Design a protein with these regions (language model features):
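Amphipathic, interaction-prone secondary-structure segments
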Residues: 2-28
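Mixed-charge, Lys/Arg-enriched low-complexity segments
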Residues: 33-79
Length: 79
C-alpha cells in the first residue's frame, strides 16, 4: 500500500493505492475532527482513478500532488 499526506487550510488529505483491494483511496481530516472517506472502500465514491482525480480537483489540491503521482493516477497505475 502506498499512502501520502498533504495539508492545506487546516485539512489533512491522505491518498494512495491499496494493492490488496486493489483500488485508490482518499480521505480528509479537519483539525481534530473525524476522518471523512472521500474515495475508496468505505466512501461514497469507489476507488477508481477517475474518482480520485475528481476528489483531488474538487478539493483544490492538484498543485500539491507530485506530477509523478498524477501521471500514474491518470494512467491508472499503482504508485
Amino acid at each position: 500500500m502506498s499512502q501520502y499526506k498533504i495539508t492545506k487550510n487546516k485539512k489533512t488529505f491522505t491518498y494512495g493505492f491499496d494493492r490488496v483491494v486493489p483500488e485508490y483511496f482518499m480521505s480528509v481530516e479537519t483539525e481534530g475532527e473525524d476522518v471523512e472517506e472521500l474515495v475508496g472502500c468505505f466512501a461514497p465514491e469507489s476507488g477508481t482513478s477517475g474518482h480520485l482525480l475528481k476528489a483531488i480537483n474538487k478539493n483544490g489540491i492538484v498543485d500539491l500532488i507530485p506530477e509523478e503521482h498524477l501521471a500514474n493516477i491518470m494512467l491508472d497505475l499503482p504508485f
